[in-house]
Amino acid sequence: GEWTLFSPDEVPELTETYGSTFENYYTRYEARAKEGKMKIVKHMKARDLWRKMVTMLYETGHPWITFKDPSNIRSPQDHVGVVHNSSLCTEITLNNSEEETAVCNLGSLNFQRLMINGKFDVDAVASTTRTAMRMLDNVIDVNFYPTIEAKRSNFRHRPVGLGLMGFHDALYMMNINFDSDEAVKFADESMELISYHAILASSDFARERGATETFRGSKGERVFSH
């Protein structure tokens, strides 16, 4: 199929929409382009565009690719804005606008330090995750913000990201091959464990400190209220 490329200043709705709404605007602009009512237009086969993108990624390592529809459909903050882009490594997708610059507060658990006598210590993971979440939440309050837009976003949504390091060290200490099914199983189970305790800690902090300004109406509230 053929894709039509537009200049962003002529199609402002495409930046702020996704899914069926985006599709409706896109087809309208395509019709306007066929009528000669758009100033800057380029037609290109989707296969050729994809090949060009993948070739650049292979040759240079950039651009990293993520997809707008899934990012917004799965966004827990879909009620307060649109996800326009991601962080460099595409692990963070937050909504932003002229009034808010998306900011995320990041930390990591070191799996190597969570290994006790060759075993992954789930109790240590639980307590460390809780401590890490509290520290990340505290960072929001004491951090330096270069712009008011960044501060406004951070205080309204209080986003945090908790990842890991030392994964391969843990596999080595458990005598698990990196490319084995057992390694995949450990990755799934360990991250599910971290996710559980991170969400549990977050909900406990909400009782202690109050929910975020934008919790009401979010996916979190919609899930927990049913």
Where are these regions (language model features)?
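N-proximal short alpha-helices
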Residues: F22, G36, I140, R156, ...
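Short, electropositive, low-hydrophobicity segments enriched in small/polar residues
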Residues: I65, F111, M165, A170, ...
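Contiguous, well-ordered alpha-helical segments that form the cores/surfaces of helical PPI scaffolds
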Residues: S108, D137, R158-M173
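Short coil-to-beta-strand
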Residues: T101-G107, T131-R134, M165
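Ubiquitous "structural anchor" signal
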Residues: D69, D169-L171, A183
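Active-site cavity-forming subdomains of large catalytic enzyme subunits
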Residues: G1-F111, M115-V122, Y145-K151, A198, ...
